[in-house]
């Protein structure tokens, strides 16, 4: 058993280094050319944020493996060299909260500051915004912790009677012993239903911070994850359905390119007008609304340009480029089909294991256990993959709603074309939702992840916090997740096969 524990510690160290390398790789390949050789602090924050997010997801499988290392021990501390998972959980999620509510906002305010101002003024402005945010968050946390930062555990009050101590022992004999030989039953076994009571204790402040961050993340996760779990595979499938069927002629290309050029000039003129308003200090609600609308138009314009380049490949290897385009859409269809199976499995598991009481089946829990029986880490790997899939669905849902809803700012993630503010926003969203993904997975896979430190934090403590426990008692987030997934499915069934019509002339709202 000790050898297994040593191997677990070594694997955890190696995986941590690999996660850091993956974070650097994603930054290098997704960053926009305009951010090359600059914006080093935001890049450091992005690498740190991605690393923390990935490690937080991987910690749940590590927690399960850590529990299995002690499965023959009477209590968890009886075996040596195990990972201190509860301490690691709290450390990671405190770091998560600091990044989301302090460090990433500071980096975004600094990066998006007026480039005409000096570095000192941009730093001062960013620090001022973050200080105000920190004071507000601190006051909210302190007040809530002081008023309702308690845990209410529902327990059953049990007691048993005892035999009366006799005054004399002379009356006892072999035929009449001191304690009757008739079958005895503990009085606690026959305790009435009204013996339930509430045991109240003060939650620790780190656990309370994690709990509130989980609530905020759960709201975002329910919305974006519920939409994304459906739009992620269906978007890929309908992208294949709407694919270009053949190469267009040169005259058609010139006509379409001319229209896109005209659109680009309109958007450039609008961007210059908004920049002048920003310099004059007119950054009100109307200005922010116009900036969001302009950002969405730019994303749509880039998509139209990419689609036009696909339909009319140029250069000496035009035929090879077209063949790669066709293969790319076939790949989208295959990945979409696989993703659809995973999404259906997720929704089915939520319904039959979480929403139906008692559960019809443990479903995915049983699959993971059987995979562990085939090979020690196979079930753990599948478990981690299902958790990662939820995070990818969150990003897909945010992208879809960002294009459809006016009040959501879109921050696209594109290979070789992601600006640092979009990077920071999506990393913050991933960090915030990663807490909820872990809580969601710990609940959905409670059978597989039983007796882990994650279940102690997210299962017992979180679901017993005063004022918050009812959201989990009545499965509010799970119902919302499934409902949004079904609504998104209907949306794609009705509108998914239609090609997007070109937008008209862009005008700033007055």
Curated annotation (Swiss-Prot):
Membrane topology classification: Multi-pass membrane protein
Superkingdom classification of source: Eukaryota
UniProt entry keywords in alphabetical sequence: Coiled coil, Membrane, Transmembrane, Transmembrane helix
UniProt feature coiled coil, ranges: 252-317
GO cellular component: membrane
Signal sequence, start to end: none
One Pfam family, short name: LMBR1
Keyword hit for Membrane: yes
UniProt KW Thylakoid keyword: no
TM annotation in the entry: 8-28, 44-64, 89-109, 128-148, 221-241, 336-356, 375-395, 427-447, 476-496
UniProt-annotated location(s): Membrane
Protein family membership: Belongs to the LIMR family.
Protein name, UniProt field: LIMR family protein Os06g0128200
Source organism phylogeny: Eukaryota, Viridiplantae, Streptophyta, Embryophyta, Tracheophyta
């Amino acid at each position: 058993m000790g050898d297994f524990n040593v191997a677990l510690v070594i694997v955890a160290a190696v995986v941590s280094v690999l996660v850091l390398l993956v974070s650097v790789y994603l930054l290098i390949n997704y960053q926009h050319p305009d951010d090359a050789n600059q914006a080093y602090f935001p890049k450091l924050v992005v690498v740190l944020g991605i690393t923390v997010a990935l490690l937080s997801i991987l910690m749940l499988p590590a927690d399960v493996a850590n529990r299995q290392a002690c499965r023959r021990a009477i209590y968890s501390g009886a075996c040596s060299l195990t990972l201190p998972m509860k301490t690691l959980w709290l450390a990671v999620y405190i770091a998560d909260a600091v990044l989301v509510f302090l460090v990433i906002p500071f980096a975004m305010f600094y990066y998006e500051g007026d480039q005409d101002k000096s570095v000192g003024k941009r730093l001062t402005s960013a620090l001022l915004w973050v200080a105000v945010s920190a004071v507000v968050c601190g006051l909210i946390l302190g007040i809530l912790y002081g008023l309702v930062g308690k845990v209410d555990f529902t327990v059953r009050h049990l007691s048993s009677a005892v035999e009366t101590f006799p005054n004399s022992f002379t009356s006892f004999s072999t035929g009449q012993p001191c304690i009757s030989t008739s079958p005895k039953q503990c009085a606690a076994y026959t305790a009435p239903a009204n013996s339930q009571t509430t045991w109240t204790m003060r939650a620790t402040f780190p656990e309370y911070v994690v709990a509130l961050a989980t609530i905020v993340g759960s709201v975002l996760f329910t919305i974006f994850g519920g939409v994304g779990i459906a739009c992620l595979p269906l978007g890929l499938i309908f992208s294949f359905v709407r694919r270009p069927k053949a190469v267009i002629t040169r005259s058609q290309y010139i006509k379409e390119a001319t229209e896109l050029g005209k659109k680009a000039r309109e958007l450039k003129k609008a961007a210059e007008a908004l920049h002048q308003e920003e310099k004059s200090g007119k950054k009100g609600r109307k200005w922010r609304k116009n900036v969001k609308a302009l950002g969405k138009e730019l994303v749509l314009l880039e998509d139209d340009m990419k689609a036009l380049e696909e339909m009319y490949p140029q250069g000496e290897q035009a035929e090879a480029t077209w063949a790669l385009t066709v293969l790319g859409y076939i790949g989208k269809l295959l990945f979409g089909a696989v993703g659809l199976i995973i999404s259906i499995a997720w929704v089915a598991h939520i319904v039959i294991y979480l929403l139906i009481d008692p559960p019809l089946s443990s479903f995915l829990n049983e699959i993971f256990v059987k995979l562990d029986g085939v090979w020690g880490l196979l079930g753990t790997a599948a478990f981690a993959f299902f958790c990662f899939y939820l995070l990818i669905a969150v990003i897909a849902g945010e992208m879809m709603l960002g294009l459809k809803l006016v009040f959501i700012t879109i921050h696209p993630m594109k290979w070789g074309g992601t600006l640092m503010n979009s990077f920071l926003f999506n990393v913050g969203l991933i960090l915030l939702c990663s807490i909820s993904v872990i809580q969601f997975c710990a609940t959905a896979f409670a059978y597989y992840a039983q007796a882990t430190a994650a279940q102690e934090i997210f299962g017992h403590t979180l679901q017993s916090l005063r004022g918050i426990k009812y959201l989990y008692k009545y499965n509010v987030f799970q119902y919302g997740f499934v409902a949004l997934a079904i609504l998104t499915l209907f949306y794609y069934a009705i509108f998914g096969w239609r090609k997007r019509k070109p937008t008209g002339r862009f005008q700033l709202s007055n």
